[in-house]
A protein has these predicted regions:
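Terminal low-complexity tails and localization/encapsulation signals of metabolic enzymes
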Residues: 1-64, 96, 100, 133, ...
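Glycine-rich, flexible loop/turn motifs
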Residues: 22, 33, 60, 82, ...
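Histidine- and aromatic-rich ligand-binding microenvironments
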Residues: 37, 51-54, 60-74, 212-216, ...
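Signature tryptophan residues that serve as conserved aromatic anchors
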Residues: 41, 83-86, 145, 168, ...
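Alpha-helix N-cap/helix-start motif
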Residues: 45, 72, 109, 128, ...
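Glycine-rich loop-to-alpha-helix module at the N-terminal edge of alpha/beta enzyme cores
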Residues: 59-149
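Rossmann-like NAD(P) dinucleotide-binding subdomain of oxidoreductase/dehydrogenase enzymes
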Residues: 148-223
Length: 223
């Protein structure tokens, strides 16, 4: 008996979380995702897509748009256009958006955890019990800093649109490390998730829509 035979004959305990919630989310979107630019979803101008797969099974999860130079330029233009208005908001007003993001992340924590596991291959215990709770805490934490920024750092100045590239090993957690402080400080964002682990960034873009984040403040280009 070889290793493959052993794996095929082993008895496995029930999974601590069902993938059904994430699979239903993918099905509702026909497992096809565009680019999130200026608060709306667009197909890549080239029409190109690539597949993202479950690393545990090699099963295709979704088709994702491949952004080209003109798509990235559009996202940067949207971030530049949104910057003056976002910067002009008081820290308290920006904090309300960050707090709303934290609440939505908390509300959909199970979906984020299961989707991250399917797309990245981490164990559900790591995504559910470590990564996603930390993501939520980062947004709550930086909502607090946004509110205190004017009094604690009265000379601070927002930089402007920032480009953020996310690695595959901590897809949503690294997003929170970069996006939360950038938005709290009055910057706008163009985010590029890792090719292999884009799905939770796209789900995050959806919740940005749901809370009414101003168009162009947060943009996602995939590829």
């Amino acid at each position: 008996m070889n290793i493959t035979d052993i794996y095929e004959t082993m008895e496995y305990s029930p999974a601590p979380e069902s993938p059904d919630l994430a699979l239903e989310w993918l099905k509702d979107r026909k497992a096809k995702f565009g680019l999130f630019i200026n608060g709306k979803w667009y197909k890549a101008k080239s029409g190109k897509v690539f597949g993202t797969n479950n690393p545990a099974t090699s099963e295709k999860l979704a088709s994702i748009s491949v952004a080209g130079k003109s798509d990235v330029d559009s996202a940067v233009s949207a971030a530049k256009k949104a910057f003056p208005g976002w910067k002009a908001l008081s820290g308290h007003e920006r904090a309300r958006y960050l707090y709303a993001l934290a609440r939505q992340l908390q509300k959909h924590a199970r979906l984020f955890a299961v989707l991250e596991t399917l797309d990245n291959g981490k164990t559900i215990r790591e995504t559910r019990d470590i990564d996603i709770p930390l993501v939520i805490r980062h947004f709550y934490h930086h909502a607090g800093w946004a509110q205190l920024l004017d009094s604690e750092f009265p000379e601070h100045t927002a930089i402007g649109p920032v480009g953020q590239i996310i690695p595959w090993n901590f897809p949503l957690l690294m997003l929170s490390w970069k996006v939360a402080p950038a938005l709290a400080a009055g910057n706008t964002v163009v985010l590029k998730p890792a090719e292999f682990t884009s799905l939770t960034a796209l789900l995050f873009a959806e919740i940005c829509e749901q809370i009414g984040l101003p168009p162009g403040v947060f943009n996602v280009v995939t590829g």
